[in-house]
A protein has these predicted regions:
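Radical SAM enzyme [4Fe-4S]-AdoMet core and its adjacent flexible, acidic
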Residues: 120, 124-125, 132-257, 261
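Canonical Radical SAM [4Fe-4S] cluster-binding loop centered on the CxxxCxxC motif
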Residues: 1-33
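Cysteine-centered iron-sulfur cluster-binding motifs in ferredoxin-type domains/subunits
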Residues: 8-16, 55, 269, 275
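Flexible mid-to-C-terminal extensions adjoining Fe-S/redox cofactors in radical SAM and related proteins
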Residues: 230-231, 237-414
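Short acidic/His/Gly/Ser-rich catalytic and metal-binding motifs that mark active-site loops
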Residues: 15-17, 113, 180-185
């Protein structure tokens, strides 16, 4: 199976997104603490590692840990805002170290929207420069986009622009905003879209990508809002292929292993033909409305077949659809898949408490992730003061708590 692990290299950032899922913490890494995490993923037999953050390019030893992960045989990827990657010498250094693929986050090709979402001016031009620099260095380039209230109506516009001006970008990842963690949790009115807000724009974007011969994945969008492209759902692909992921969080959560991908459903979802392979509503019904969900009636095995026969996917292969059915049924019976989906009541509430559902979805693993030092604490406090000033200037709220931040992120999985 093509399991991918995540290492949060840092948790600070040079941007200030009002919906950030993994904001600043006092934890820090050095090379040795990251090396242990790379070894952990190798020991698990994982295919690759995604270096993420915060903004991973801010760590001074990023090229060294990339080189180590590549030497250990991992396919090394990185998620970045692109601010530093636009430096062609830096991009070349990362390529030489073994970085194979980079996900550059671009939320909108409208400069004013991108600046508002990033909390900084000039970010769009730097992201475009990062695309070009990475491509020139021989790094495969993907684009990540978090779907939110400010870009929900023009996702297809961004695709059209990027195809025209950066034609070497061949893969896109769409992440529907998770409003249950980080700053998004306290700024829902500003950033969380309704599912219907982006349905048409997303469909147009995916159609454009498909017709241009590009690939794409979509995260945290229920299949009733992307039925034609159900095979491209990240959660659906993980459910079908019985995959897991490990995230080495640089906060109080530390290392977690996720093996289940189903979340919240409306009562009507029980009749849906795609229910067994749908991730449902990611936020457990606290911001999105389960009333927006509706059953669809299409051939589920047609979706499964397209996922299993994908020639670009390095996952395990089943010898036949019948063999997959047996494994899938056994996994569901054993609780590895599908045991944790909550059902929304008539009032939209979940039958599961948030903490219970999280415990069912995420299993802790005892691998130490970073540490809190006196210097790290001082830097954290200084960053929090600076971020507080930015939040006030932008009219957004700071996240709840201090060190812990939530249980997921925009992953960029392919």
């Amino acid at each position: 199976m093509a399991n991918l692990g995540y290492i949060q290299v840092v948790r600070h950032c040079n941007h200030f997104c009002g919906f950030c899922s993994n904001p600043t913490t006092p934890y820090t890494h050095d090379f040795e603490s990251m090396r242990v995490l790379v070894d952990d993923l190798v020991a698990r037999g994982y295919f690759g590692v995604i270096m993420t953050g915060g903004e991973p390019t801010l760590h001074p030893e990023l090229p060294r840990i990339v080189a180590y992960a590549a030497e250990r045989g991992l396919h090394v990827r990185m998620i970045t805002n692109g601010w530093r990657l636009g430096d062609r010498a830096f991009a070349a250094e990362l390529a030489a170290a073994g970085l194979r693929l980079v996900h550059v986050s671009i939320y909108s090709v409208r400069p004013e929207v991108e600046a508002r979402l990033r909390g900084a001016e000039g970010t769009l031009g730097r992201a475009f420069a990062a695309l070009d620099a990475a491509h020139a260095a021989g790094i495969e380039v993907n684009v990540n986009c978090v779907i939110n209230r400010l870009n929900a109506d023009h996702l297809d516009e961004s695709v059209r622009y990027l195809i025209a001006h950066h034609p070497f970008v061949r893969h896109f990842v769409w992440n529907n905003l998770d409003p249950s963690m980080g700053r998004a949790e306290v700024n829902q009115e500003s950033f969380v879209p309704r599912l219907a807000d982006f349905e048409l724009s997303l469909h147009r974007a995916l159609r454009l990508l498909e017709r241009s011969g590009r690939s794409f994945r979509v995260e945290k969008v229920p299949l009733c809002y992307m039925t034609e492209f159900a095979w491209a759902s990240t959660e659906t692909r993980k459910i079908v292929k019985l995959e897991e992921r490990v995230v080495h969080f640089l906060d109080d959560k530390q290392t977690v292993r996720q093996t289940e991908w189903e979340h919240l459903y409306a009562p009507g979802c029980a009749a849906c033909s795609l229910r067994p392979i749908c991730g449902g509503l990611f936020d457990r019904g606290e911001a999105y409305d389960p009333a927006e969900l509706a059953p669809v009636f299409v051939d589920m095995e047609g979706v499964v077949r397209r996922i299993l026969e994908d020639p670009s996917d390095p996952s395990r292969r089943w010898s036949s659809l019948a063999a997959w059915r047996r494994d899938f049924a056994a996994a569901r019976a054993g609780g590895d898949v599908g045991a944790s989906g909550g059902v929304a009541g008539d009032d939209g509430s979940s039958e599961f408490r948030r903490d219970v559902l999280r415990d069912m979805q995420i299993g802790a693993v005892s691998v130490p992730v970073g540490r809190v030092t006196a210097r790290g604490r001082r830097l954290y406090e200084a960053r929090r003061r600076s971020e507080g000033e930015k939040a006030e200037a932008l009219g957004v709220q700071m996240e709840r708590g201090a060190a812990a931040s939530g249980d997921g992120e925009a992953t960029g999985e392919g």
